[in-house]
Amino acid sequence: MAAPEPARAAPPPPPPPPPPLGADRVVKAVPFPPTHRLTSEEVFDMDGIPRVDVLKNHLVKEGRVDEEIALRIINEGAAILRREKTMIEVEAPITVCGDIHGQFFDLMKLFEVGGSPANTRYLFLGDYVDRGYFSIECVLYLWVLKILYPSTLFLLRGNHECRHLTEYFTFKQECKIKYSERVYEACMEAFDSLPLAALLNQQFLCVHGGLSPEIHTLDDIRRLDRFKEPPAFGPMCDLLWSDPSEDFGNEKSQEHFSHNTVRGCSYFYNYPAVCEFLQNNNLLSIIRAHEAQDAGYRMYRKSQTTGFPSLITIFSAPNYLDVYNNKAAVLKYENNVMNIRQFNCSPHPYWLPNFMDVFTWSLPFVGEKVTEMLVNVLSICSDDELMTEGEDQFDVGSAAARKEIIRNKIRAIGKMARVFSVLREESESVLTLKGLTPTGMLPSGVLAGGRQTLQSATVEAIEAEKAIRGSSPPHRICSFEEAKGLDRINERMPPRKDAVQQDGFNSLNTAHTTENHGTGNHSAQ
């Protein structure tokens, strides 16, 4: 009797099908941004009150809201801002914050350091948008907080809250990519409603930029018409654009105001000008933003009459533009004691410059290969092949001319190949230069000149007194002063479309980009 055959093992199950193209995450710890846009029912409760935590959690994940919800938030916030005075009056205790510049994830850190808006009074000094890539998230979140806490959270206007700068820098493009031009226009209307200054505790004038030769009293500010695009000159422009002089407190000139050569508009004001304004208006100090600070803040020379710093600058965007390596700070004022709380930058999602997509980013590689092939195709032509069958009809000069034309074409394509090669090989340096030039474009001729030109690239300031040094390919910006020098051209008011030349230069003007949880406290009585 034959032995039974051994049982055969069941065949192994087929392997699971591969994930759809693009569905696999290279960095698996980083989740996809949610594709669902929050609806009205999710953002607002039955009474029309915003659910701020729902919105915050969604925005932190890079989520978006329905366009109609974005418009509702912006318009409701604007309606509250329109009812406020041009110079609002606020009381201590309060936390004063400087520039944010689209750094939404650092704004979340700011509220951790400064305290919950539910039980902390806040005053923001402007510049919520531009340069950073999460500006619309900053606007939506701050406007929702304004709707929730209209009497304890206050927003002033900065020089970037205008059509001119948001078109020139990144905010308009961001709105169109993430939402639409309708959302951008709604933001512009809301920005026109932002107050220009705040009087804190009847002791401090809080403003984005500083003083104006046309403003002598607080009533001069109260009388300004703020519901418009800021002009290129005048008191409204000065409140948003002016700066303390570079030798503030040690001036050699006795002129209170001088032309602001850094901004290309408005003025520098000096220590005597500030002291005179404080004395005439019975104030202790001026608190302003508008300038990046290595420590996140700066206290200037003390007033001789009060012994208090005559001027304080606060800046709340840490590691500005991802290159400044600066700390950020907020100012907490309570019981006549002023504390400065510093904080470092938080991790954030990465965007290519100017919201570039990966296909555009890959074009230099593709272009290099295509031009390389063209050069090779054209280069295999011998002198004999450059002649036609009817060569006897042409004289020697014509044949030489045809060969020279072909050679010129080969040289032109070779030059193009060189551009693409530099773009690909030096992409990191190109990124750095793009981020630190106002239009997001490299200086003309840099790429065609190859590596040597890239290493010595310069960006001319509008008045061209001095060119700003560029970055060499292997170099990384490693100090605050170096970043500030490279970014100096972006501090200027950009040229306006209706620019006219006056006195040899434009009368138009520009602006001013691993989480550490440590905070520092410094007190000034």
From Swiss-Prot:
<comment type="subunit">
    <text>Forms a complex composed of a calmodulin-dependent catalytic subunit (also known as calcineurin A) and a regulatory Ca(2+)-binding subunit (also known as calcineurin B). There are three catalytic subunits, each encoded by a separate gene (PPP3CA, PPP3CB, and PPP3CC) and two regulatory subunits which are also encoded by separate genes (PPP3R1 and PPP3R2). In response to an increase in Ca(2+) intracellular levels, forms a complex composed of PPP3CB/calcineurin A, calcineurin B and calmodulin. Interacts (via calcineurin B binding domain) with regulatory subunit PPP3R1/calcineurin B.</text>
</comment>
<dbReference type="GO" id="GO:0017156">
    <property type="term" value="P:calcium-ion regulated exocytosis"/>
</dbReference>
<keyword id="KW-0378">Hydrolase</keyword>
<dbReference type="InterPro" id="IPR006186">
    <property type="entry name" value="Ser/Thr-sp_prot-phosphatase"/>
</dbReference>
<dbReference type="GO" id="GO:0032991">
    <property type="term" value="C:protein-containing complex"/>
</dbReference>
<dbReference type="GO" id="GO:0030018">
    <property type="term" value="C:Z disc"/>
</dbReference>
<dbReference type="GO" id="GO:0006950">
    <property type="term" value="P:response to stress"/>
</dbReference>
<keyword id="KW-0007">Acetylation</keyword>
<dbReference type="GO" id="GO:0031987">
    <property type="term" value="P:locomotion involved in locomotory behavior"/>
</dbReference>
<dbReference type="InterPro" id="IPR004843">
    <property type="entry name" value="Calcineurin-like_PHP_ApaH"/>
</dbReference>
<dbReference type="GO" id="GO:0044877">
    <property type="term" value="F:protein-containing complex binding"/>
</dbReference>
<feature type="region of interest" description="Calcineurin B binding">
    <location>
        <begin position="357"/>
        <end position="379"/>
    </location>
</feature>
<dbReference type="GO" id="GO:0005516">
    <property type="term" value="F:calmodulin binding"/>
</dbReference>
<dbReference type="GO" id="GO:0005955">
    <property type="term" value="C:calcineurin complex"/>
</dbReference>
<dbReference type="GO" id="GO:0046983">
    <property type="term" value="F:protein dimerization activity"/>
</dbReference>
<dbReference type="GO" id="GO:0004722">
    <property type="term" value="F:protein serine/threonine phosphatase activity"/>
</dbReference>
<feature type="region of interest" description="Autoinhibitory domain">
    <location>
        <begin position="475"/>
        <end position="497"/>
    </location>
</feature>
<feature type="region of interest" description="Calmodulin-binding">
    <location>
        <begin position="402"/>
        <end position="416"/>
    </location>
</feature>
<dbReference type="GO" id="GO:0005829">
    <property type="term" value="C:cytosol"/>
</dbReference>
<comment type="similarity">
    <text>Belongs to the PPP phosphatase family. PP-2B subfamily.</text>
</comment>
<feature type="region of interest" description="Catalytic">
    <location>
        <begin position="65"/>
        <end position="356"/>
    </location>
</feature>
<feature type="short sequence motif" description="SAPNY motif">
    <location>
        <begin position="316"/>
        <end position="320"/>
    </location>
</feature>
<dbReference type="GO" id="GO:0006468">
    <property type="term" value="P:protein phosphorylation"/>
</dbReference>
<dbReference type="InterPro" id="IPR041751">
    <property type="entry name" value="MPP_PP2B"/>
</dbReference>
<dbReference type="GO" id="GO:0043029">
    <property type="term" value="P:T cell homeostasis"/>
</dbReference>
<dbReference type="InterPro" id="IPR029052">
    <property type="entry name" value="Metallo-depent_PP-like"/>
</dbReference>
<dbReference type="InterPro" id="IPR043360">
    <property type="entry name" value="PP2B"/>
</dbReference>
<dbReference type="GO" id="GO:0005886">
    <property type="term" value="C:plasma membrane"/>
</dbReference>
<feature type="region of interest" description="Autoinhibitory segment">
    <location>
        <begin position="417"/>
        <end position="424"/>
    </location>
</feature>
<dbReference type="GO" id="GO:0001975">
    <property type="term" value="P:response to amphetamine"/>
</dbReference>
<dbReference type="GO" id="GO:0001915">
    <property type="term" value="P:negative regulation of T cell mediated cytotoxicity"/>
</dbReference>
<dbReference type="GO" id="GO:0035774">
    <property type="term" value="P:positive regulation of insulin secretion involved in cellular response to glucose stimulus"/>
</dbReference>
<dbReference type="GO" id="GO:0030217">
    <property type="term" value="P:T cell differentiation"/>
</dbReference>
<dbReference type="GO" id="GO:0045202">
    <property type="term" value="C:synapse"/>
</dbReference>
<dbReference type="GO" id="GO:0098978">
    <property type="term" value="C:glutamatergic synapse"/>
</dbReference>
<dbReference type="GO" id="GO:0005509">
    <property type="term" value="F:calcium ion binding"/>
</dbReference>
<feature type="binding site">
    <location>
        <position position="290"/>
    </location>
    <ligand>
        <name>Zn(2+)</name>
    </ligand>
</feature>
<dbReference type="GO" id="GO:0005737">
    <property type="term" value="C:cytoplasm"/>
</dbReference>
<dbReference type="GO" id="GO:0001913">
    <property type="term" value="P:T cell mediated cytotoxicity"/>
</dbReference>
<dbReference type="GO" id="GO:0023057">
    <property type="term" value="P:negative regulation of signaling"/>
</dbReference>
<dbReference type="GO" id="GO:0010468">
    <property type="term" value="P:regulation of gene expression"/>
</dbReference>
<keyword id="KW-0597">Phosphoprotein</keyword>
